[in-house]
């Protein structure tokens, strides 16, 4: 069985050796996991993967010294290997809840603990979070393209079994109505769903009669269950839909059937074919028969089908979700922001890679708008315990300024807002204290959070930007470190 805690890069451990030998192993470090830019011109992403991160952290240290000798050989590593074998994570971890909506540069996960313990979590944590957040964010986009149910059907296209199982979980959190993956359904208690393959139809003989026999047999062997006939194996309109109607009627499947029944289209002009199938089904009194559509769908194709008035009741989406096809690599990073109480940052040659230093906390501010109801108005990331953080915690009036335009600001008066802390402690002194949520609860939480943003902020194309700021104290700390660094660099470069 793989121990995912050691799905890591070797340099995490060679750096750890330096920390260990130089007496730095117990320095208190704070790392932030965050992303800089949302994919596909989104303003935000959907959090998924936190539960697997916690599980991974709990498995740290469950390996014999012989395991470490395989990649850290030699007598000079012997003492360090013994340390690693016994090393468990003893610090604290704060994380956003799965299903939360997160914006660029906000800490999704904050790791606070001894330096080596915190450092070696980087690679496996990013592996988990980048995969699941890519899938969840894409699934949210696909689901927002329609008000009709979207099922996740992408396991066969996923990048391995692990990706299929946890990708399906992420897709459901972000809005998918169901998944075809039975392992995800079994582990989560959420259940799974499915239809039939073309091979099922052709196994009864490559003929029109064989197609009817396939449908008839399936109905007879699955009475009381969902009955979805795949009707495009040979010809959708000239035999497929007609055989499905005949099989339904001959087996007494009509609008009184409680198990749910329908047909699936997997090729061709889905808008035209769905309209024709709807007409034929209705003519035969099967008005409750659902029409499912698959065939390399994504949010853009679904949006276009909806625009054309396609008679589709449910969509099945595979690789577009399972691989986050248009943006398969999510951009979470894991950066040191504080060491032994001293804030640090990475300045970099690229402005986008400049990070926020210090031990942080993010608040989401909600107001009751007379015309829109309860809506989120601004997110602000503060240094823990700074002036703005204290005001928000006390419910006092406060003002937030735009980080890049200090003339843009907004004041919230006492009593007119509610504040929600986005990062909650999930591991305390190495002990898992995270609350347990079902997959259905995570999905409901994500939907509820999304509905508190305005429609313009949720749209797929050119969404309106939601206000995301940092506190004055955090801004000033960042600027002071940068100013000091620039002076040091200038002095160093001119006096070398």
Model regions: which residues?
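Gly/Ser/Thr/Ala-enriched C-terminal appendages of enzymes
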Residues: 1-27, 40-42, 284, 297-496
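Short coil/turn segments at secondary-structure boundaries
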Residues: 68-69, 137-141, 154, 458-465
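Buried, small/hydrophobic-residue-enriched core segments of structured protein domains
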Residues: 1-28, 37-39, 75, 81-284, ...
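N-terminal, Lys/Arg-enriched amphipathic/low-complexity engagement segments
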Residues: 22, 28-85
């Amino acid at each position: 069985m793989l121990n995912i805690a050691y799905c890591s890069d070797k340099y995490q451990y060679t750096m750890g050796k330096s920390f260990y030998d130089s007496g730095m192993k117990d320095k208190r470090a704070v790392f932030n996991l965050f992303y800089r830019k949302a994919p596909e011109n989104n303003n935000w992403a959907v959090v998924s993967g936190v539960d697997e991160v916690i599980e991974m952290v709990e498995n740290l240290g469950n390996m014999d010294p012989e395991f470490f000798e395989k990649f850290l050989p030699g007598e000079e590593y012997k003492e360090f290997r013994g340390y690693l074998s016994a090393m468990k994570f003893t610090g604290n971890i704060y994380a956003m809840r799965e299903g939360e909506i997160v914006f660029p540069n906000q800490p999704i996960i904050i790791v606070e603990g001894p330096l080596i313990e915190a450092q070696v979590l980087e690679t496996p944590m990013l592996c988990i979070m980048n995969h699941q957040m890519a899938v969840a964010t894409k699934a949210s986009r696909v689901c927002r393209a329609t008000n009709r149910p979207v099922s996740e059907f992408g396991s066969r296209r996923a990048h391995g079994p692990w990706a299929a199982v946890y990708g399906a979980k992420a897709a459901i959190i972000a809005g998918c109505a169901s998944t075809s993956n039975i392992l995800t359904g079994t582990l989560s208690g959420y259940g799974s769903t499915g239809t039939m393959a073309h091979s099922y139809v052709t196994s009864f003989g490559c003929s029109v009669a064989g197609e009817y026999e396939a449908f008839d047999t399936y109905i007879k062997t699955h009475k009381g269950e969902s009955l979805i006939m795949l009707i495009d194996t040979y010809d959708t309109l000239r035999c497929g839909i007609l055989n499905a109607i005949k099989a339904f009627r001959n087996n007494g499947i009509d609008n009184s059937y409680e198990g749910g029944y329908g047909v699936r289209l997997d090729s061709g002009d889905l808008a035209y074919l769905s309209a024709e199938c709807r007409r034929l089904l209705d003519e035969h009194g099967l008005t409750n028969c659902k029409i499912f559509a698959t065939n390399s769908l994504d949010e853009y194709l679904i949006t276009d089908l909806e625009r054309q008035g396609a008679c589709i009741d449910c969509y099945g989406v595979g690789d577009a979700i399972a691989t986050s096809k248009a943006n398969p690599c999510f951009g979470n990073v894991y950066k040191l922001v504080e060491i032994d109480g001293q804030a640090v940052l990475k300045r970099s040659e690229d402005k986008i890679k400049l990070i926020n230093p210090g031990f942080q906390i993010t608040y989401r501010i909600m107001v009751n708008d007379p015309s829109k109801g309860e809506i989120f108005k601004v997110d602000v990331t503060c240094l823990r315990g700074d002036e703005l953080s204290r005001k928000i915690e006390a419910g006092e009036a406060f003002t937030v300024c735009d980080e890049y335009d200090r003339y843009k600001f907004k004041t919230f008066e006492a009593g007119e807002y509610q504040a929600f802390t986005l990062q909650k402690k999930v591991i305390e002194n190495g002990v898992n204290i995270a609350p347990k949520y079902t997959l259905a609860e995570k999905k409901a939480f994500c939907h509820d959070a999304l509905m508190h943003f305005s429609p313009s902020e949720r749209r797929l194309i050119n969404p309106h930007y939601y206000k995301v700021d940092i506190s004055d104290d955090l801004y000033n700390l960042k600027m002071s470190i940068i100013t000091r660094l620039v002076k040091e660099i200038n002095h160093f470069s001119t006096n070398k």
